[in-house]
């Protein structure tokens, strides 16, 4: 009798486990389809359709950081910056990634909130330091904040990571704008002789705008 009850309990547990697995699979399939709709809507500039799909994902999984990140990009495209900032802040609080923090910094920069932009770019750099575009963004906001030392340091680091015409030209421009002709001429000479090393990009690699 005891063994019969034990067997029934085992079967019941196994049935519950199978049911849970089936529910998880169905939810996963639904979220996958919603992502397809969201991506298609973004590609076709059908923003309302994409927004509805992303909001539905967040109803199912309220801690889905990639969905908040993508929703932030959608709002930014429509210049709804306050909503974009909210989304990127939530995404970063759930899962701080270089992409979500960089996106947050870009929106703060766009809305002229340079101090917060600088903080966001710094946090992104702590997580991913080896991308020139992140240093260029940090250089731009440092310039706005009047910190030329940080600006030049960031531009020089960008050149170390990706020594190409674009990174050198940005540093040269910064020198010219400050009347630092000798330094600008030195960069000009380097540009004339520049040979981009094998395996290095010829233009600045831009960060992915979202991680899924």
Language model features by range: what are they?
Residues 1-33:
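Long, contiguous interaction/recruitment modules in multidomain scaffold/adaptor proteins
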Residues 23-83, 93:
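Alpha-helical segment of the N-proximal tetratricopeptide repeat
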Residues 43, 77-78, 110-111, 144, ...:
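Register position in tetratricopeptide repeats
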Residues 62, 95-96, 129, 162-163, ...:
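Short coil turns that delineate tetratricopeptide repeat
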Residues 67, 100-101, 134, 167-168, ...:
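TPR alpha-solenoid repeat register
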């Amino acid at each position: 009798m005891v063994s019969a009850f034990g067997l029934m309990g085992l079967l019941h547990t196994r049935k519950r486990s199978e049911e849970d697995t089936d529910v998880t699979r169905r939810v996963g399939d639904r979220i996958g389809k919603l992502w397809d709709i969201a991506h298609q809507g973004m590609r076709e500039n059908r923003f309302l359709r994409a927004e509805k799909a992303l909001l539905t994902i967040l109803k199912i999984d309220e801690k889905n950081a990639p969905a908040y990140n993508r929703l932030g990009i959608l709002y930014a495209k429509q210049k709804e910056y306050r909503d974009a900032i909210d989304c990127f802040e939530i995404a970063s609080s759930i899962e701080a990634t270089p992409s979500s923090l960089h996106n947050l910094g870009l929106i703060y920069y766009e809305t002229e909130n340079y101090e917060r932009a600088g903080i966001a770019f710094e946090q992104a750099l702590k997580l991913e330091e080896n991308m020139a575009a992140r240093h260029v963004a940090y250089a731009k906001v440092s310039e706005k904040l009047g910190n030329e030392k940080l600006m030049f340091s960031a531009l020089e680091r960008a050149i170390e990571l990706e020594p190409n015409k674009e990174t050198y030209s940005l540093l040269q421009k910064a020198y010219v704008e400050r009347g630092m002709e000798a330094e600008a001429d030195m960069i000009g000479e380097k540009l004339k002789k520049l040979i981009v090393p094998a395996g290095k990009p010829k233009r600045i690699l831009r960060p992915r705008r979202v991680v899924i």
